[in-house]
C-alpha cells in the first residue's frame, strides 16, 4: 500500500472497530471486517471526518501549523499521517438505504457534505425532490457569499488555519446538532 492509502485504510478500520487487531504496519488489510455492534449513520459521518483521533498519529496537514514546514512529496514522518478527512476532500456522500422508502422515491436518503465534511454538515437529499434551497444552487468557481458551498469552504479554511480559535469544538457540536435534528425529521 502507498503510505497515504495505508493511513486512511488503517484509521478507517480503527474508527469503525477500535478493538480490531490490525496494526498500522501490517503488510495488507482485509477488505471486509465485522464489528460487535451495528454501525450507525453517525459512525459513517465520523468515519469521513476522521483525522486520526484516538491514535498516536497527527494529520499530515498539521505539520506546518506545528512549525515543521510543509510535507515534501514522497517523504514520510513517523507521527504525521494522511487522514481520511484531508484538505483535498471537496465533498462527501453517504447513501442510507431504508426499507420503508420505495425505490421510486430513491430507496433512502443521500447525505451530502457540500465541502469538506470536517467542517460542513451533512445535508439530507431525497430521490424525489424537485427543488433545493437557493444557496445550494449557486454555481461558480470563486467565492460567492450566496453559495452554501463557498460559505462552508470558507469556514473550513478558517478552522484549518486557526485551530486554536476553534479548539472548543463548537463548530463540530453545532454540525452534529443540526444533523441529529435532520435525522429524525
Question: Could you say what each language-model-derived stretch is?
Answer:
Residues 1-185:
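C-terminus-biased signal that marks the final domain/tail of proteins
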Amino acid at each position: 500500500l502507498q503510505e497515504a492509502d495505508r493511513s486512511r485504510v488503517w484509521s478507517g478500520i480503527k474508527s469503525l472497530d477500535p478493538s480490531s487487531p490490525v496494526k498500522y504496519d501490517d503488510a495488507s488489510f482485509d477488505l471486509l471486517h465485522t464489528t460487535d455492534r451495528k454501525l450507525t449513520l453517525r459512525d459513517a459521518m465520523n468515519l469521513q471526518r476522521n483525522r486520526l483521533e484516538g491514535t498516536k498519529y497527527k494529520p499530515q496537514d498539521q505539520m506546518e501549523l506545528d512549525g515543521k514546514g510543509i510535507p515534501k512529496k514522497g517523504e514520510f514522518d513517523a507521527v504525521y499521517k494522511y487522514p481520511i478527512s484531508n484538505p483535498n476532500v471537496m465533498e462527501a456522500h453517504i447513501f442510507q438505504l431504508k426499507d420503508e422508502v420505495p425505490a421510486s422515491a430513491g430507496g433512502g436518503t443521500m447525505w451530502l457534505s457540500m465541502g469538506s465534511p470536517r467542517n460542513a454538515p451533512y445535508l439530507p437529499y431525497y430521490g424525489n425532490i424537485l427543488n433545493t434551497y437557493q444557496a445550494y444552487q449557486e454555481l461558480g468557481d470563486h467565492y460567492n457569499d450566496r453559495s452554501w458551498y463557498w460559505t462552508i469552504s470558507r469556514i473550513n479554511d478558517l478552522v484549518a488555519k486557526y485551530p486554536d480559535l476553534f479548539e472548543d469544538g463548537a463548530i463540530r457540536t453545532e454540525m452534529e446538532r443540526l444533523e441529529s435534528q435532520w435525522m429524525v425529521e
